[in-house]
């Protein structure tokens, strides 16, 4: 299969310095709303890159659950590989890719666990099946079969058949506090528009156009 000729010409939008908000969180919010309004499949899907204390990288897709000017929050099992790497090295990167809009956003920052109370508030909004799934999945561990996983799900479902399902002690959220944003807009002839925001010591953001 010849994949060398697979390419698209990006022609939808341009991005100039005058288009940008001085606040990268507000700029992200604008683009995120446009991605949602375009009815893209899971516009909150983001690639999360972590690395161990030995520098070995890992990458996976997780779902952004909310964000504000304090950071970007996702939820996971605190015993998963990603959580173990964050414990060793809290510096991570995010990537949002919205191909139909010919856009991507890259974010670098530091991850930290949110409070149990904040995790609990989100956990109570999850569908009951997702709450049960959090209890029965020992994320990233080796299992012998899917049947074993489904049997454990039924066991947990019976255990919590009555009343509310409690928050697992091993499950919760992380907040990624950014120190760098990059907004990328595809353009014709691969002359893409790229702008970076870098956090300064006085908590202002320095904006630069980058070569594509």
UniProtKB/Swiss-Prot annotation:
> Transmembrane region positions?
none
> Keywords assigned by UniProt?
Flavoprotein, FMN, Oxidoreductase, Pyridoxine biosynthesis
The record's remark on the cofactor is:
Binds 1 FMN per subunit.
What family does this chain come from, according to its entry?
A: Belongs to the pyridoxamine 5'-phosphate oxidase family.
Query: What's the Enzyme Commission number for this chain?
Result: 1.4.3.5
Name-wise, this protein is Pyridoxine/pyridoxamine 5'-phosphate oxidase
Q: In which pathway does it act?
A: Cofactor metabolism; pyridoxal 5'-phosphate salvage; pyridoxal 5'-phosphate from pyridoxamine 5'-phosphate: step 1/1; Cofactor metabolism; pyridoxal 5'-phosphate salvage; pyridoxal 5'-phosphate from pyridoxine 5'-phosphate: step 1/1
Q: Which organism is it from?
A: Rippkaea orientalis (strain PCC 8801 / RF-1)
- List residues binding substrate: 7-10, 65, 122, 126, 130, 190-192
What cofactor(s) does the depicted protein rely on? FMN
Which reaction does this enzyme catalyse, per its entry? pyridoxamine 5'-phosphate + O2 + H2O = pyridoxal 5'-phosphate + H2O2 + NH4(+); pyridoxine 5'-phosphate + O2 = pyridoxal 5'-phosphate + H2O2
| Name of the gene this protein is made from | pdxH
Entry-linked Pfam families: PNP_phzG_C, PNPOx_N
State if Metal-binding is listed as a keyword.
no
Query: NCBIfam families from the entry?
Result: pdxH (TIGR00558), PRK05679.1 (NF004231)
Residues annotated as binding FMN are 60-65, 75-76, 82, 104, 139-140, 184, 194
